[in-house]
Regions:
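Glycine-rich, flexible N-terminal cofactor/catalytic loop recognition
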Residues: 1-57
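Short glycine-rich anion-binding loops that position phosphate/pyrophosphate groups of nucleotides
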Residues: 11-14, 82-86, 161-163, 222-224
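Short active-site oxyanion
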Residues: 25-31, 104-106, 154-155
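Conserved helicase motor
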Residues: 54-61, 134-136
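Glycine/small-residue-rich loop that forms an oxyanion/phosphate-binding "nest" at active or ligand-binding sites
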Residues: 56, 64-113
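A charged, well-structured terminal subsegment
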Residues: 70, 140-156, 174, 218
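A contiguous loop/helix-start segment that scaffolds small-molecule binding in enzyme catalytic cores
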Residues: 75, 154, 158-236
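Class I SAM-dependent methyltransferase SAM-binding "motif I" and its flanking Rossmann-like core
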Residues: 94-151
Length: 236
């Protein structure tokens, strides 16, 4: 029987790949790639030639059984996403679950994921936070946000550059234009940008020009009442 490795890849700067990730990619028989063209660039950078199989959100349900059979047949497989850690707002969960159901050993390597540097760069509390990933674009979006209205922990969202301003406006309407937030863009790349301010200030900043790159929004949680305020509410 083979084995499944989940291998994180750089979120922008190719030099951020770990030595262990390189060793695993050298060793495996097959690399499952979210986009084979993107992964080929990384493999070429590392001087590697591998069998590449396409494995993305549009084909994973149809492909997962075949992949598991391949591993059960003795092949060692690595799953990578275009950037970051597989399974975090990327394909991976379904394959991992199916492998475990079939007794296949799964090993996940530690490595890059965009929300960690964005969270730390924000300056907001990192002790407790909730990762929301990509919000639904239409169905269920309002309900999801309504569920977060009372959230006191720092919240983290992924967003596309094309929807950033629209999402910030929606956040301002729900959470208040004076709620503190931060936006990280193009993390680890040449034009990395980290902007912090109120939601209104962020709307003004990113409305001034075209937004490009991968986006992480970090939203401060609902401020907790001071103890004397909470006591007053109880007395009322």
């Amino acid at each position: 029987m083979g084995k499944l490795y989940l291998v994180p890849t750089p979120i922008g700067n190719l030099d951020d790949i770990t030595l262990r990730a390189i060793k695993v990619l050298q060793m495996v028989d097959i690399v499952l790639a979210e986009d084979t063209r993107t992964t080929q660039v990384l493999l070429k950078h590392l001087g590697l030639e591998k069998r590449l199989w396409s494995h993305h959100k549009f084909n994973e349900h149809a492909a997962v059984e075949s992949v598991v059979e391949t591993i059960l047949g003795g092949e060692t497989v690595a799953l990578v996403s275009d950037a970051g850690t597989p399974g975090i707002s990327d394909p991976g969960f379904l394959l991992v679950r199916t492998c475990l159901e079939h007794g296949v050993e799964v090993e996940t390597l530690p490595g890059p994921t965009a929300f960690v540097p964005a969270l730390i760069n924000s300056g907001f509390s990192c002790d407790r936070f909730c990762f929301e990933g990509f919000l639904p674009q239409k169905k269920g979006r309002s309900k999801r946000l309504q569920q977060l209205l009372e959230e006191s922990r720092t919240m983290i969202f992924y967003e596309s550059p094309y929807r950033l301003v629209k999402t910030l406006i929606q956040f301002a309407e729900l959470f208040g234009a004076d709620r503190e937030a931060a936006v990280s863009r193009e993390l680890t790349k040449k034009f990395e940008e980290n902007v912090r301010g109120t939601l209104q200030e962020l709307i003004d900043h990113f409305s001034a020009g075209e937004v490009k790159g991968e986006i992480v929004i970090v939203l401060s949680g609902k401020p907790r009442k001071a103890k004397h305020e909470a006591d007053s509410d109880d007395e009322e």
